[in-house]
Amino acid sequence: MTLRVVPEGLAAASAAVEALTARLAAAHASAAPVITAVVPPAADPVSLQTAAGFSAQGVEHAVVTAEGVEELGRAGVGVGESGASYLAGDAAAAATYGVVGG
């Protein structure tokens, strides 16, 4: 079985994941104030309790999504590092054959 890897493709994928990570982080940052501080529609106990419950769920959601965005960012970095590793390995292998340049 042969695995053909294009380091430039991995670098492009890494950049795309980095851009996606930034967009997701921005979207979650703009949504966090709205979902973590739900305003009750009235001052009665049921409205207050429901709004507090929704706010607590919003806080939990914000934490989980932040962790997800962080993990996505780490995955993108890993893809980029893999591409750099393949590129270095290719250069080292080419050097053993006395090939100079590309």
Swiss-Prot record:
Keyword Secreted in record: yes
Key words of the record: Secreted, Virulence
InterPro entries the UniProt entry points to: PE-PGRS_N (IPR000084)
Localization per record: Secreted; Cell envelope; Cell surface
Secreted is among the record's keywords: yes
Pfam families: PE
Residues in PE domain copies: 3-92
Gene3D superfamilies found in the cross-reference section: HP0062-like domain
Cellular component terms per the entry's GO annotation: cell envelope; cell surface; extracellular region
Disruption phenotype: PE5-PPE4 double mutant exhibits a severe iron phenotype but secretes EsxG and EsxH normally. Mildly attenuated in vivo.
Similarity section: Belongs to the mycobacterial PE family.
Function summary: Important for the siderophore-mediated iron-acquisition function of ESX-3. May play a pivotal role in the evasion of host immune response by M.tuberculosis. Mediates production of IL-10 via activation of the p38 and ERK1/2 mitogen-activated protein kinase (MAPK) signaling pathways.
Protein's UniProt name: PE family immunomodulator PE5
Gene transcribed to yield this protein: PE5
